[in-house]
């Protein structure tokens, strides 16, 4: 058999059919085959390979395996993956979404009998799963160059009209759209053109925010760039901030912006690029659109967030509410998609009035494209929960990795619930579930369908240190070597969206605790950055022991870790760690925890053990404090004394109510040092004076009630 003839025939057939296909070449000479495939694509390709094995000049773009985002947003005749060893699902999913109609996604690897795409010391189930998935691909060719045989092949007959059928000349604009036809001609689908019209109305109207959503490959970012060009042309914007995870991630927006400015004939603008060539600022005589990193971005007359799930819901909320207008894009399904749960959350946090639009047609390939469907199915990029069974009959079960690897329906039903636990999911989550020997999946099953799922990770001395995410932080906070301590970390737990607030999550958690206790674990831990779920863990008897000093780069919130002891050793460690956190929250509240929501700081502090405060008043400070308590001076005039006395009271007692507005205001003002203008907003006071009055009244009351505590802590 002529291997090269088979490969070239497959590629030619793809071009004629306008389908996209998967090509897998098993070979002992990866470099030679990568060069051949790049030649078939005429160099119009993206190559994913290690820097050490980079093949200069064979493809238009290159990305190392750890930076697949370098090629995302690009469009190529082929994407070629030549990665030895571990082949992460995110590499396949990300590269596959860059291939245009009639092109191919190629994986160049070892021959099938020697190819192991999984990690070292894994279970081997990812290899089994991926091999089965390749054979199931409806348009693929898997060939073994060494033996000269076809491992498997398939070519689905498919007819359809895709985005290539889009004709700007036949497009009928909406009445009063105001968008020049020459700008519409820059669109690549009708849904892009409709979205452009809607965004033009958004810029002209009184809307505060707009949400553009859709699966990956629908042209969301590009049409936002066209809309920005329209707004600049109409002089509807001046200064705008463009926020995304990296400069690379916003290049589709910048490409649409520059294309739109060119089409509209807007000259005289200046383009600033990074040393790597990425556009980070476009400015003209009356407008300036500049990229800012999520953690440094400031409010602006217009803020544009490209990929909200990657920026983080907390940052999106902060930026949008403090800016004039907000334009936000989020990916529902696809590589780094957030799922519909997050897409449904965004309208609740964006300022009103608000418009929402969704792009449905792919711009690079046919709708219903078999490669897209394969990627979405195999790597759970469109996983949504199934219809739930009767929850009253639910029973706890452990779902084995073997079942997950071999029964795709079970995997989809489990994964469809788990994706609700995170704002942003990646295909690599699947790799961990199948390959890590320390992962466990537990579920509440009703009528054969999961209604609640927990993803659990075992952490102990036999696990690599970098994988002991919560345990290492717990031992650090406790100041304990913790040799031999084993904990179970609940990485994710979620309940079917139609069955929440019925106690199913707590019931499943109790089952996990029982299994952990039976195995000899000392604690169950968890760590997350979705602060809205803190009450769930506190309700179930967990104590906080760690809050990260920095934001989680995904959610824009700080990571919070909690634990529940299962034996005396675990209880002793957690007690020490939680007391350490109490001191950190109180004493570092005005620095590293100043940006933590005051109500969350109060709630977490209240659920730590009472501890003796290492704080004392001088005689002069005690005198100043008495003056404040008698109403002779305001709190700010005796702030140092109020600070010491209030922190001592909050640390040593737990009789205070963490949700009382006065307490929350006192925490915001005294512990965190926030201005009264912000305190007023936090506690719902209509004026600054009202906020001052409420906070000072509360402080006087709590300090009078704890007089015996702080009055005995005066330095002679």
Swiss-Prot record:
GO terms for cellular component: cytoplasm. The keyword Transcription regulation does not apply. It is an enzyme of class 2 (transferase). ATP binds at residues 192, 217-226, 364. The keyword ATP-binding applies. It is found in: Cytoplasm. CDD domains: NAT_SF (cd04301). One of its GO terms (molecular function) is tRNA N4-acetyltransferase activity. Its main location: cytoplasm. Keywords: Acyltransferase, ATP-binding, Cytoplasm, Nucleotide-binding, RNA-binding, Transferase, tRNA processing, tRNA-binding. It catalyses: cytidine(34) in elongator tRNA(Met) + acetyl-CoA + ATP + H2O = N(4)-acetylcytidine(34) in elongator tRNA(Met) + ADP + phosphate + CoA + H(+). Residues 401-567 form the N-acetyltransferase domain. Pfam families: Acetyltransf_1, NAT10_TcmA_helicase. Its EC number is 2.3.1.193. Acetyl-CoA binds at residues 493-495, 500-506. GO terms for biological process: rRNA acetylation involved in maturation of SSU-rRNA; tRNA acetylation; tRNA wobble cytosine modification. It comes from the Archaea. Belongs to the RNA cytidine acetyltransferase family. TmcA subfamily. Catalyzes the formation of N(4)-acetylcytidine (ac(4)C) at the wobble position of tRNA(Met), by using acetyl-CoA as an acetyl donor and ATP (or GTP). This is tRNA(Met) cytidine acetyltransferase TmcA.
